Amino acid sequence: YKFNNQREPLMFLDAIYGDKNIYSTPRDMMKWDYALSKDQLFAEKTLEEAFKGYSHERRGTRNYGLGWRLVEMPSGKKIIYHNGWWHGNNTVFSRLPADSTAIIVLGNKFNRSIYQAKKIAGIFKGYGIQSDDDE
């Protein structure tokens, strides 16, 4: 459904799998994060290359790796993430590998406020994202 409770119509891109139409649960996303952090799916060297910035799309901390968006903090810490949306659903999947943490938020009705989940990283030291509670 759309934000105004209208049904999303089917369209030709609905049959593209891998780019869209991947449905999951928070538990499955947690397993995915665990597998990435324990080198169960890919070699450590492969992940190092995937999580390295190549595009330097914006001056400063924002970058794009191989299929992953990156925020590279001056502290040396990284937020590795990829958000998603399609036809009324949207997701936030962020990894804070230095703190063995994943932020996973899945929504079944498109709502831009879901992307505010990035502020959770501000709980951890060295990410430079300030929450209202920071001193």
Q: What is the meaning of each model-derived region?
A:
Residues 4-135:
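Catalytic loop of the DD-peptidase/beta-lactamase superfamily, centered on the K-T-G motif
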